[in-house]
Amino acid sequence: ELVLNDRLIRIDKNDSMNVWYWRDWLIKTPKWVKKKISLRLDENTGYKSYRFGLNKKNYILARVVYKAHNPDWDITDSSQNNQIDHININSLDNRIENLRVLTSQHNKWNTSAKGYYKCNFTNKWRAEIRVNGKCIKIGRFTEEADARQAYLNAKEIHHKVPA
């Protein structure tokens, strides 16, 4: 159970598998007003998230799930030092073991395929990484997988995300 805006919210889940069933998931207030959760897509970034409204305020489900398991965490603080990160990069996987609080910069480092691209001029794959605002060139590769691996190796060195 969780209290938001002086309203009690009951979070139902399948405890045996610890899997949230989003399509059938309902937020229930003390008056048992059912609130549906909607899937939102940010067309600028492609970021998908589950959201719902309560008392004329919108909530991102990942933040609510994290708050339910961490009562002392401030759900209203959306500053750069208080971002919810999905460890496995799937923004729709809101299991508590997949959520952590990071700074905005650390959160941006945990993204899917980036750091390599196909160079039209050389017809090779180029890998590069940004560190403290500077672009470091890693190299050119004939195979995409090699460029990706080189980027991931550099990412492990330069982008150490705190546990």
What are the functions of these language-model segments?
Residues E1-S49, G53-L54:
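Short helix-coil boundary/hinge micro-motifs
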Residues K35, K57-Y59, I136-K137:
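Short beta-strand segments
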Residues Y47-L54, N58, K155-V161:
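Short, solvent-exposed cationic patches
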Residues N55-N132:
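Short, cationic Gly/His-enriched loop motifs
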Residues Q105-K108, I157-A163:
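Extended, polar beta-sheet/loop recognition surfaces of beta-rich domains
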Residues K134-E144:
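A short, exposed loop/beta-hairpin motif centered on an aromatic-Gly-Thr core
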Residues T142-H158:
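A short, charged, amphipathic alpha-helix used as a generic interaction element across diverse proteins
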